[in-house]
């Protein structure tokens, strides 16, 4: 439906090319989009500008339009509240700074058996224990779950199956990154190009041992960034 609307407007903006890509996660990530649309590959540690590209999402473009053409600053955004644990899933136009618990209340409240509330999506979102946290400019979704979709184990053991490597869109080695992240080995993490990880969550999702690979990478990223900045 969105594609039809865009194509119907194409005659008014002939200098804009519209491309429809297959739905395949994480196709929407900037490096994957650039590779799919231009066949240009960004080298490890580089940014899109290094291959002459800039990527903006729909919300950013809309905010730029309102600011430049209408003189309206970014004070609100669209937030989706969904999941089995929310009474009335829906979309809201929300003022930045609105507490999560206010939105959840307007959406009918949480189920008594709610186990987790996530800011963001199921693959890249962050669990929120404090629902007084505010909506920020990057908040696009609040996901309310009845059970832990990741099924994390208490003492997970790597089986060396290699599935996490096979699904990584950045061609990294999550199993080794996890090992060195646990012992905060900055040298090896740098060698493995940890900073190129986009935290898409594919490795954690496919892991048969339910190892929290992305969680470990996020923690290690802070350690490595501190070492790089020295």
Report the location of each language-model feature.
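Iron-sulfur-cluster electron-transfer modules
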Residues: 1-36, 160, 194-195, 199-204, ...
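Alpha-helical scaffold segments in soluble metabolic enzymes
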Residues: 5-8, 63, 67, 102-106, ...
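Conserved active-site and cofactor/substrate-binding residues in soluble primary-metabolism enzymes
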Residues: 1-4, 55-63, 76, 87, ...
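Active-site gating/interface segments in enzymes
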Residues: 26-28, 32-41, 108-159
């Amino acid at each position: 439906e969105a594609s039809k609307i865009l194509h119907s407007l194409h005659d008014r903006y002939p200098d804009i090319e519209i491309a429809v890509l297959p739905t395949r996660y994480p196709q929407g990530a900037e490096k994957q989009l650039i590779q799919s649309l231009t066949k240009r590959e960004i080298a490890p540690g580089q940014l899109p500008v290094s291959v002459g590209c800039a990527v903006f999402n729909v919300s950013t473009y809309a905010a730029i339009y309102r600011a430049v053409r209408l003189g309206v600053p970014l004070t609100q955004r669209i937030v989706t509240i969904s999941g089995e644990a929310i009474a009335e899933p829906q979309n809201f136009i929300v003022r930045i700074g609105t507490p999560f618990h206010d939105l959840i209340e307007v959406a009918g409240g949480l189920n008594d058996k709610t186990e987790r509330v996530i800011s963001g999506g199921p693959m890249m979102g962050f669990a929120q224990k404090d629902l007084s946290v505010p909506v920020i400019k990057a908040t696009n979704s609040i996901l309310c779950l009845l059970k832990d979709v990741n099924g994390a184990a208490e003492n997970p053991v790597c089986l060396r199956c290699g599935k996490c490597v096979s699904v990584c869109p950045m061609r990294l080695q999550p199993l080794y990154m996890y090992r060195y992240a646990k012992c905060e080995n900055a040298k090896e993490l740098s060698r493995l190009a940890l900073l190129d990880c986009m935290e898409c969550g594919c490795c954690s999702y496919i892991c048969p041992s339910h190892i929290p690979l992305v969680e470990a990478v996020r923690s290690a990223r802070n350690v490595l960034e501190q070492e790089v900045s020295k």
